[in-house]
């Protein structure tokens, strides 16, 4: 189970684009460490791995359709490397990152994989305080074109949407690993944004 080296090199170039501060190859490597650490949990690891590599491949903070464009890029790049069913599932995972919600109509195994992927993608919310603060600074840098007041209001809305969820994470694994720290980080960040 691997992604061809020439595709990885193309992705690294994308993740190195100048508008990125958080959504870089470092983010992908962090998720890959979580993916590897949870190796026994995945039912369909290959499409999950491909989704992991491509989920932020297209990233333009001025556009609302990055996830869709990333899924389409995966569908192009993955053709001939993944079977049709795996490719469709990998693209579905990427599309689910737009709202960080698990869609209906999945098998139990696919639902579990997609939920766990969304959890590792949001693991940054439950990172150590210093790591989370750097994440917040990096997100602000990616949206440097947005005036401060508008950014603060928009960012507070996004963070509140997670903080107000009964469970930020979908899986027991995610809740055990990251929920408590995520709630502390979100509360602290929201207090700063609303100050």
Identify the role of each PLM range.
Residues 5-12, 25, 29, 49, ...:
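Short, well-structured alpha-helical segments
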Residues 21, 60, 64, 80:
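Short gly/ser-rich anion-binding loops that grip negatively charged ligand groups
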Residues 1-2:
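Acidic/polar low-complexity segments with low predicted structural confidence
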Residues 27, 66-70:
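Hydrophobic (often cysteine-bearing) scaffold residues that line and stabilize catalytic clefts
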Residues 14, 70-104:
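Histidine- and acidic-residue-rich, metal-dependent catalytic cores
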Residues 16-23, 29, 33-44, 54, ...:
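Divalent metal-dependent phosphate-bond-processing catalytic cores, especially two-metal-ion Mg2+/Mn2+ enzymes
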Residues 31, 45-61, 70, 91-98:
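His-Asp-centered metal-binding catalytic motifs of divalent-metal-dependent phosphohydrolases/nucleases
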Residues 43-46, 64-66, 82-86:
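Short, flexible active-site-proximal loops enriched in glycine and acidic residues
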């Amino acid at each position: 189970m691997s992604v061809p080296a020439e595709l990885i090199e193309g992705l690294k170039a994308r993740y190195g684009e100048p508008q990125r501060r958080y959504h870089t190859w470092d983010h992908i490597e962090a998720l890959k460490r979580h993916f590897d650490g949870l190796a026994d949990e995945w039912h369909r690891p290959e499409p999950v791995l491909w989704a992991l590599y491509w989920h932020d491949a297209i990233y333009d903070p001025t556009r609302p359709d990055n996830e869709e464009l990333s899924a389409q890029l995966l569908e192009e790049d993955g053709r001939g490397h993944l079977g049709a069913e795996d490719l469709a599932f990998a693209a579905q995972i990427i599309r689910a990152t737009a709202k960080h919600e698990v869609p209906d109509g999945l098998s139990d195994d696919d639902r579990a994989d997609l939920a766990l992927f969304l959890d590792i993608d949001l693991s940054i919310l439950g990172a150590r305080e210093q790591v989370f603060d750097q994440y917040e600074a990096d997100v602000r840098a990616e949206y440097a074109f947005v005036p401060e007041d508008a950014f603060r209001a928009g960012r507070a809305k996004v963070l509140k949407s997670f903080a107000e969820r009964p469970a930020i994470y979908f899986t027991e694994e995610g809740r055990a690993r990251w929920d408590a720290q995520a709630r502390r980080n979100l509360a602290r960040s929201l207090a700063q944004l609303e100050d």
